[in-house]
UniProtKB/Swiss-Prot annotation:
Stated role: Binds to DNA and alters its conformation. May be involved in regulation of gene expression, nucleoid organization and DNA protection.
Family: Belongs to the YbaB/EbfC family.
Family matches, as Gene3D superfamilies: Nucleoid-associated protein YbaB-like domain (3.30.1310.10)
Domain of life from the UniProt record: Bacteria
GO cellular component, one term: cytosol
First-listed, main subcellular location of the protein, grouped into a coarse class: cytoplasm
Subcellular location: Cytoplasm, Nucleoid
Protein name: Nucleoid-associated protein LSL_1227
Length: 104
């Protein structure tokens, strides 16, 4: 009976440690800045790991009033590039927590 209580207490401590580590990793990921680029850096965007855009840079030569569609495409390419990097890093960082848990 005493042994079972010790195992449960040990398991709870391990879960608390795991939860603390997950939060730390998530906080670090959220604070990381990811850049997305399009067409030789004609458009560069910056996002934090929690998907908040912090900056966008558009080179003057990418701005053509007669071709707004091109600029829109470049912005989309840069944003999608950044999102892809965030997703990849999130999977690498947080995936370790769900690999050995059934059902996740």
């Amino acid at each position: 009976m005493m042994m079972r209580g010790m195992n449960m207490q040990s398991m709870m401590k391990q879960m608390q440690k795991l939860q603390k580590n997950m939060k730390k990793d998530q906080d670090e990921l959220n604070a990381t800045v990811f850049e997305g680029h399009a067409a030789d850096d004609a458009v560069v965007v910056k996002f934090t790991g929690d998907h908040k855009m912090t900056d966008i840079s558009i080179k003057e030569e990418a701005i053509d009033p007669d071709d707004v569609d091109m600029l829109q495409d470049l912005v989309l390419m840069a944003v999608n590039d950044a999102m892809s990097k965030i997703d990849k890093q999130t999977q690498e960082t947080m995936g370790k927590y769900s690999r050995n848990i059934p059902g996740l």
